[in-house]
Curated annotation (Swiss-Prot):
Stretch forming the signal peptide: none
Protein's recorded name: Acyl-coenzyme A thioesterase MBLAC2
Membrane-related topology note: Lipid-anchor
Sample GO molecular function, one term: beta-lactamase activity
Superkingdom of origin: Eukaryota
UniProt GO cellular component terms: endoplasmic reticulum membrane; extracellular exosome; mitochondrion; plasma membrane
Amino acid sequence: MSALEWYAHKSLGDGIFWIQERFYESGNRANIWLVRGSEQDVVIDTGLGLRSLPEYLYSSGLLQDREAKEDAARRPLLAVATHVHFDHSGGLYQFDRVAVHHAEAEALARGDNFETVTWLSDSEVVRTPSPGWRARQFRVQAVQPTLILQDGDVINLGDRQLTVMHMPGHSRGSICLHDKDRKILFSGDVVYDGSLIDWLPYSRISDYVGTCERLIELVDRGLVEKVLPGHFNTFGAERLFRLASNYISKAGICHKVSTFAMRSLASLALRVTNSRTSP
């Protein structure tokens, strides 16, 4: 199957494109975002990487400008992982320039498939990317990041800037990217319109509460109008406030006890199915 068949996209305007893997039918299917800039383009998360995402970006014309095709072809392209979980980081190995938060840089460099929580089944991939492919073959490949991110760093695209916000809780290196001028938040799995997951091996409820407090502050200060999440559909500031507030209100003793049990089971299952490093 070609890359052009595997992926699909739609434009949200203002140089932002929403890309998805068509034949990965799962709640884990991650949103891939392409953000065009005057001096640099950024891909936010890369999906599973079962087909070449860079090939799709070029073949579909997403990295070309009608007025200046040659300049666009030479424009730097940076792949940023909002975190290293498999559904977001699987395609990072296809890019020359890769950025990740420092808390998860070592796991990515090792190809640590326990920390990437690799969990994929044949039934979720409804059309195999190549003959004989099986989900048990899938691993997140080790990638040496070329850019280590910290809270407050700014990724300069020329005519727009993306500010890194370290937002742990879902994972220890989770980040959001904030386009302050346009009041857009690329949230990864920090927040999306669904049940927030805090029971994975490196999740931490206390961190998540602090992260949700930061999200509420963004809304209160009028700094976010639109959220482009790691899963499901986009939403606005009012929904962001409600999602963050609901998490904080539910993060009591009972939630912590049940989450501890779920984390223990998830960790056991992941250790059985994944080696610490990719082959």
